[in-house]
Amino acid sequence: MSVLAAIAVLAVLILVHELGHFVAARSQGIHVNRFSLGFGPVLWKYQGAETEYAIRAFPLGGFVGFPDDDPDSDIPPNDPNLLRNRPILDRAIVISAGVIANLIFAYMLLLAQVGFVGIGQASQPGVSIQQLAPEVSAVATNAGLKPGDVILSANQKEFGTSLQEIEALRDIIKNSPGKSIQLTVARGDERLSVNVIPEAKPAGGSIGIGLAPNGKVERRPVSLSKAFSVGASEFQRIVVMTFKGFGQLVTNFGETASQVAGPIKIVEIGANIAQNDTGSLFFFAALISINLAVINILPLPALDGGQLAFLLIEGLRGKPLPNRIQEGVMQTGLVLLLGLGIFLIVKETTQLTTQLEWVQKLFQ
């Protein structure tokens, strides 16, 4: 059932996003005629007083429909409660509410992670070298480092038991291309001093190692008062990490484009977590929720950020762009996004080891 659990996580995050739009509109008295979770054929629907609620066959998507675009609507075109007739601020609140809902939900998930499941900590201080990657960089191999070595400090910065120490070491390496880093390394009972000079790569310094926590990872829940601060710290870290990732995609597209994950890959990662480490599902969901928020706020056609960009232009011009221009831009963006989605799905499906294994995971 691990794949179903991962799909359920994605469906919930999409539901939260669309609920943000829906609640923001209804709370302002704006007409909403459709609320749908998923795309494709309708599996279930309910007609409310004004809104049709539906669940569709493919859960990795959803939408909130407004009668503004419905030619069969009985609502007069000049009705003040149509979305298009509302002031710019009201429309901006509705458009941005999905992103805000995803961010709030992500923070709540992180609170649950640290307060109930606990924070992961290694049983011993330091960062373990899990493997060498000479095909990426031969620096570590040439320096004599070996799998199983434990890095205790880098440039006199000591590493404790927190799982964030791995990221701290990566940052030191990434930010020091061509500069000497003095490592204190434990190999059995020995203490070694190893000097490495990270090789300059487009994404920063690299020495060609894979890192892991040192020893068994244990989770320890924190008090409620501490959970808020720790959750906020984790939230900030993930948001910054996400924006950095998108920044690298723009500045170094050739090397980072291959790391972009589509829905198949995300479900595969989520299924592995659900099967092997269910305690990390909250963190996984928070990470995807923040990514969903950041992606949607980008000023790209067919995304929330693109619609906000149109509102900004309208505010500066004093009137909206002609409908034909807006529709042309949005349709072009939608085609490009659908094309990218189909490409990622096809690529990731072919990369699965075998379709039989993938189907079998549905029942594990």
UniProtKB/Swiss-Prot annotation:
| Cellular compartment(s) | Cell inner membrane
Q: Where does Zn(2+) bind?
A: 17, 21
Q: How does it sit in the membrane?
A: Multi-pass membrane protein
GO BP, sorted A to Z: proteolysis
Please name the top-level EC class of this enzyme: hydrolase
Q: What is its EC number?
A: 3.4.24.-
Per its UniProt record, the required cofactor names are:
Zn(2+)
Q: Known InterPro entries for this protein?
A: PDZ (IPR001478), PDZ_sf (IPR036034), Pept_M50_Zn (IPR004387), Peptidase_M50 (IPR008915)
Q: Which keywords does this Swiss-Prot/TrEMBL entry list?
A: Cell inner membrane, Cell membrane, Hydrolase, Membrane, Metal-binding, Metalloprotease, Protease, Transmembrane, Transmembrane helix, Zinc
Molecular function GO labels: metal ion binding; metalloendopeptidase activity
Annotated protein name in UniProt: Putative zinc metalloprotease all3971
Q: Cite the source lineage.
A: Bacteria, Bacillati, Cyanobacteriota, Cyanophyceae, Nostocales
